[in-house]
A protein has these predicted regions:
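Short, highly charged, low-complexity non-transmembrane loops/tails of multi-pass membrane proteins
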Residues: 141-153
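Hydrophobic alpha-helical bundle signature of multipass membrane enzymes
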Residues: 1-110, 127, 131
């Protein structure tokens, strides 16, 4: 079995790895002169991060999770956002992204970073806006063969 420090290093590398992959996918259209596509992919990522960190700041100011005896899991929120983005940009790999997220949650529980309630409540609040954003952006940012018509208001 891997020791705590090794598992800690793996956990610490997870979201930066996903973030780096998002950035790579976001800028990959630039060599083909697809500035708008790159800008939309970057906007999707930044918007989901605003949701994650905006809720973190709201929790710090209002003490929402502590009032329930819980802790807002920024790690979980950012991981959910990253998996949502990657699932939008690389839809064929969506099951892999989701499996990696579940494994990350299990690792956080094993390492005692957060409780199941911390992760579940964070996911319950973060997932809906992230999924909505990904679905809204998908027609504009997904690979050509996977683009759907934009939803009508």
């Amino acid at each position: 079995m891997l020791d705590y420090e090794t598992l800690d290093a793996i956990a610490d590398a997870y979201t930066p790895l996903l973030g780096g992959l998002w950035l790579l996918l976001a800028v990959s259209p630039l060599p083909r002169g697809q500035w708008r596509l790159a800008a939309l992919r970057i906007a999707l990522g930044l918007t989901t991060l605003v949701v994650c960190y905006g809720l973190m700041f709201a929790d710090k100011a209002l003490g929402i999770w502590p009032a329930l005896g819980l802790d807002y899991s920024t790690h979980s929120a950012v991981a959910i956002a990253a998996v949502g983005i990657l699932g939008t940009l690389l839809p064929r790999l969506r099951p892999t992204w989701i499996a990696s997220l579940l494994a990350y949650f299990a690792l956080m529980l094993y390492q005692r970073y957060h409780s199941l309630a911390d992760i579940a409540t964070t996911a319950a609040v973060i997932a809906p806006p992230v999924v909505w954003l990904c679905m809204r952006f998908a027609p504009h940012v997904a690979p050509i063969g996977h683009r759907q018509p934009a939803p009508q208001p």
